[in-house]
Amino acid sequence: SCYDLCRPCGPTPLANSCNEPCVRQCQDSRVVIQPSPVVVTLPGPILSSFPQNTAVGSTSAAVGSILSEEGVPISSGGFGLSGFGGRYSGRCLPC
């Protein structure tokens, strides 16, 4: 035999080498990779408000037609709070 033991792992000089194969497994290298912190930004909720118009005391023709369609009699020149009487159910009018 050429050598009883294989040469150490790594580059070796070519001097004093022979042609007999020598297989040696070096110990495994261990590398610890720690993940870097990741910051994730989540968008917050979008809050929007729309003010609602109040129909009390309005003289608009559109409001008048809505009220007359729902069975509340109004005069052509507008209406006051007395026009609701006992028929006002407390429902909100559509904008």
Curated annotation (Swiss-Prot):
Entry superkingdom: Eukaryota
GO cellular component, one term: intermediate filament
Gene Ontology molecular function, alphabetical: structural constituent of cytoskeleton
Sections of the chain in a coiled coil: none
Pfam family, one: Keratin
Cysteine pairs bridged by disulfides in the record: none
Keyword ATP-binding set for record: no
Keywords: Acetylation, Keratin
Residues where N-acetylserine is found: S1
InterPro entries: Keratin (IPR003461)
Similarity remark: Belongs to the avian keratin family.
Subunit structure: The avian keratins (F-ker, S-ker, C-ker and B-ker) are a complex mixture of very similar polypeptides.
Name of the molecule in the record: Feather keratin B-4
Native source organism of the sequence: Anas platyrhynchos (Mallard)
